[in-house]
Design a protein with these regions (language model features):
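Catalytic alpha-helical scaffold of carbohydrate-active enzymes acting on polysaccharides/glycoconjugates
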Residues: 1-141, 147-202, 207-209, 213, ...
Length: 228
């Protein structure tokens, strides 16, 4: 039987309010709290909460044989705490099953890793501290923003205490190699690399509801046959 690694990524930014020229020097609060509340609450009830309930149900129905992982940004955690705390209660239940791993990522879902290693480390530590405080878990795997990875980053990830990293299974990098294997980082062999299967992931993320797609509708049986 093949092992399937499910990773679900959650991020919600703080949205900026309309800021006019005449507000400069007078109004120093830049965020649209009403819009943040509306979007985060709506998305949580339409997507995040039903998905988390489904994951919890699958874990319970399969006696822990079903496993998954979740990467959630610090910004998202802040907003859920403020607007939809019941979703965090669900994530806490998932954490307690021992079948859902929490993966670290930059607190602000930023691009700090590209040019500011100290800021990147600070944000990652902030996320890890928040996950430890809220769910009692310590991440050992990291998913950088948009799955960004480069060899110079690997030693820093090891220094931060990570054993593995998720990254993109980019065709132009892999060439003939498959994304369905665990690789070692060339610059830090202790770091394991898990690659996203672009096709199988995008079949769910983007093509699932596309009625113009040649494989629509995507059924469970069809998807399982592709995995095999």
């Amino acid at each position: 039987m093949k092992s399937i690694c499910f990773n679900f990524e959650i991020h919600q930014p703080f949205r900026l309010k309309r800021y006019r020229f005449f507000d400069i020097g007078r109004d120093h609060y830049y965020f649209d709290d009403f819009l943040n509340d509306d979007i985060v609450t709506r998305v949580a009830h339409n997507s995040y909460i039903p998905a988390a309930e489904t994951l919890l149900r699958m874990i319970e129905q399969n006696d822990g044989r079903f496993r998954c992982s979740i990467a959630i940004s610090g910004m998202a955690l802040e907003q859920f705490e403020q607007y939809v705390p019941e979703f965090l209660d669900l994530l806490e239940k998932l954490a307690k099953t021992g079948c859902c791993e929490f993966v670290a990522q930059p607190y602000a879902y930023s691009l700090a890793s590209l040019s500011e290693p100290e800021e990147f480390a600070r944000q990652v530590k902030m996320t890890c501290d928040r996950l430890k405080e809220r769910f009692g878990v310590k991440p050992t795997v990291i998913r950088n923003t948009e799955l960004i990875y480069f060899d110079d980053l690997a030693p820093q990830l090891v220094a931060l205490g990570f054993k593995g990293a998720l990254t993109e299974g980019a065709k132009h990098i892999l060439g003939w190699k498959s994304p369905n294997y665990v690789y070692n980082a060339a610059s830090a062999p202790k770091l394991k690399l898990l690659l996203r299967n672009v096709k199988l992931s995008d079949d769910i993320a983007f093509r699932f509801s596309d009625r113009g797609w040649g494989e629509w509708p995507l059924t469970t049986q069809k998807y399982v046959s592709w995995l095999g």
